[in-house]
Amino acid sequence: DTARYPEAVSALTDLQSTLTKHVTALEAYNERTDGGGVKEALKEAVAGALGVAAGFYDQLRPTDKVSRMIRDAYTATSLAAISYHMLYTTALALKADDLAALALGNLSDLTDRIGQLSETVCTVVAAELTDEDKTIDPTVGADAVRATQAAWATMEETS
């Protein structure tokens, strides 16, 4: 029941809004791009990114637990993010600076959303487990957020 998890609803709504914006921008780019030659390779890359973003909507199932919805959204968003890596690299290689900027901007949007989802899933899982077993301490969600975010921060420090 999503009504019990306003932070999850907020994260998923933010993601949906972001992906809608991405689809609109990618479609606009696709419409103003002529077919053929070098442009055809870009069209394929754009179409791939569009497909990932559009496919996200099909993965949200209202009958699932909220934690599963977040997990599925995280997975789809990670796929979209790696697609933007590929689109950005393709655009750079083909000297399509406007598309490179679009891909990098969209990737930046998604990194924020992935972070939001990764924090939210911990508190939602803890709450769902508490619903199933009242002996579970729901504050472990906040502990999990701190530890998992620290793990990501450690990865960033070493790269």
Q: Whereabouts are the PLM-identified features?
A:
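A structural signal for alpha-helical segments
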Residues: 3, 7-10, 14, 37, ...
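Hydrophobic secondary-structure block in the mid-to-C-terminal portion of proteins
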Residues: 100-159
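Acidic/histidine-rich alpha-helical segments that form the ligand environment
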Residues: 1, 45-95, 99
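Short N-terminal signal/transit or membrane-insertion segments
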Residues: 1-21, 118, 131-135
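Alpha-helical transition-metal enzyme core signature, strongest for iron centers
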Residues: 12-27, 46-53, 73-84, 103-118
